[in-house]
Structures are given as C-alpha cells and as structure tokens.
Amino acid sequence: MVKIFIDPGHGGSDPGATGNGLQEKTLTLQIALALRTILTNEYEGVSLLLSRTSDQYVSLNDRTNAANNWGADFFLSIHVNSGGGTGFESYIYPDVGAPTTTYQSTIHSEVIQAVDFADRGKKTANFHVLRESAMPALLTENGFIDTVSDANKLKTSSFIQSLARGHANGLEQAFNLKKTSSSGLYKVQIGAFKVKANADSLASNAEAKGFDSIVLLKDGLYKVQIGAFSSKDNADTLAARAKNAGFDAIVILES
C-alpha cells in the first residue's frame, strides 16, 4: 500500500496568490480533489490523506506533522504561482537525491504532457513542506494566476481535470500504481482530434452546456471525455443527454 499525502496549498484566511478573479486556495483544492477522485476510482493499493478537503486554514507545521504522523510515503503539495511569468514548474528540497529526484522528473514530465503549459523546469527550494516532511516531497506550481493566458486556462474545469490527470499519471509511473482490477470503466467521449486546440474548443463548448469535460491524449489523439462510469447504464444516460445537446457522443469500455 502506497501512502500519498496530498496538500492543497493555502486555505481559509490565507487565500494565497490572487489575480484575474481567481484565488490560489480555490484552485489548489480543485486540483487536489480531482486528483483524489482519479486515484480513488482508478487505482488499487494506494491510500490517500489530504491536508484539507474544504476552504479551511491549516498551518505549515500542521501539514507536515499530519504527513509525518501518518507515515506517508510521498508528500505532494499543490500550488499556483504568481509574479508575472507563465507555465508549470516543480520543486524539491536542495540536495536530497534519489528517489526524490526521480519522482520529480517523472511527475513533472507527465504534467507537462497532460496540459498546455510552458515548461519552466525542475527546481529546488527551501520550502517548509519540502524541508520538514520526513518522506520524499514535491511541490508543483501550476501556472501563474496573475497572467491572463494562464488564468483563463485555470478557469476551465477541463484544464483543472487535465492538471489532476497529469499528476495522477506521474504518481502512477513513479510508484508503479496498478489500475483497479475491475471490468473497466465506461467512458463517454464526444470527440477525438489530432489538433489539441480543436479538442479544447469542443471541451469548452461542452462545459458551456453543463458538462464536465477533460481532454486526454491517447493513441496520438486528443480525446474529449465527459464522464467515466463503472455502470454502463450511467454512461448510456450521460451519452443520451450529450446527444440531445448536439454532441456526437459514444460510450467506450476501457479496462
């Protein structure tokens, strides 16, 4: 059993960075909760604990103490940047060596593959959560809240889902996580494109009509997915609703 501690940065009276009508504390929680859902629904042999699951203040000491007392195998702190830049970067504590450096490289690479963010590189910093955690720790900075282009991406649920998916893919690779040994998931797909911009456009259209969407890169195509279910009946119901809304929806069983 791999024990992963997920830390959505800031919260409560501490909003974190702000800009373009967004607050960092809200975005970090959205990414963390989406990541928890993916890991819980799609993987086995993984145990999760979050530093917070709502808009509450948690001190830095309480965050690392919770992870240390729980005996986590990995500490993942999720943040959003500010300062006028653009793109994604990740941090580990200086001079920690393997396996932390390996985990950083793997997760960083998977996030970059999953989202349309510039790669600002793998970095080190003397952050509290990296220094005081008793296990390998990584802090990710997911775009710049005060840069309009980054903020516009962070405002869409499909982009938040893609960020969560990138983190999940990285954790799968880093810790050799196994997919749940079920009969698979029935996924509702409304499009597949060679050009990511076309997939993003369809995803935005779906969101405007009330569907949660995510863009996934698989087999060389950017696929727009609006749901995944263990029950085919639930998938069929969503597909029918999507068709009524004008989308060319199909249900795909993936093991």
From Swiss-Prot:
Changing D55V: Loss of activity. Zn(2+) binds at H10, E24, H79. It comes from the Bacteria. Its EC number is 3.5.1.28. Its cofactor is Zn(2+). The keyword Disulfide bond does not apply. Sequence repeats lie at residues 184-219, 220-255. CDD domains: MurNAc-LAA. Changing N81I: Loss of activity. Optimum pH is 8.5-9.5. InterPro entries: MurNAc-LAA_cat, N-acetylmuramoyl_amidase_3, SPOR-like_dom, SPOR-like_sf. Keywords: Cell wall, Cell wall biogenesis/degradation, Competence, Hydrolase, Metal-binding, Repeat, Secreted, Sporulation, Zinc. Residues 180-254 form the SPOR domain. It is an enzyme of class 3 (hydrolase). The active site is at E141. GO terms for cellular component: extracellular region; outer membrane-bounded periplasmic space. Autolysins are involved in some important biological processes such as cell separation, cell-wall turnover, competence for genetic transformation, formation of the flagella - in particular of its basal body - and sporulation. CwlC is able to hydrolyze type A cell walls such as B.subtilis. Its main function is to lyze the mother cell wall peptidoglycan, playing a role during sporulation. This is Sporulation-specific N-acetylmuramoyl-L-alanine amidase. It comes from Bacillus subtilis (strain 168). The gene is cwlC.
